[in-house]
Amino acid sequence: DPFRKRSDFKVNIKEFERNNKKIHGRFVNFWDRPDLDEIPDIVEPSMHGMVEVMRGCGRGCKFCDVTLRSLRYYSPEKVKKEIEVNIKKGGMDRAWVHSDDIFVYGMDPTTTKNMEPNRDALEELFTAIMSTGVKHTNPTHGTLAGAIADEKLIPNLSKIINAGPDNLTGVQCGFETGSIRLIEKYADRK
């Protein structure tokens, strides 16, 4: 039984309000995650050349379960090694960079004002990716808020990855809204 007598398992009872009624909710906390160095490197090519660069998200959106996972980043060296496996064993010339929000890469959400991207960490990551010799790289997911929070970020990354009319790059955005009320209620760190 994985829940018996474990120090990382606990039940919190919290009071919150919904529709002017007090509700007592039970929340189960179970901390069972591997350390980053316990996650093995890939040894065979990944599908479509996709490599993971981070796990979790620090934005804390109320509708998303990814925010429940702790935020952790793979080093540029680990990412580079996995891309090299895809190149050598899979013949890939591109790298799909998987994350739940690429613009959170390298930041410490507990100290980062307004969740501004860590431009230095992102530039280091994409420089390492391109140093493998791939012709194209593309992040899988990101937020519009992260993309526009630093006006130099997108132009700098575009230069690093050689983006242009012959090398289009995009990012898939998840739930986004222009409503200030909804953002404040459900995603106040965007």
Stretch-by-stretch model annotation:
Residues 1-78:
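Acidic, low-complexity intrinsically disordered segments
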Residues 84-190:
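Conserved SAM/AdoMet-binding glycine-rich loop
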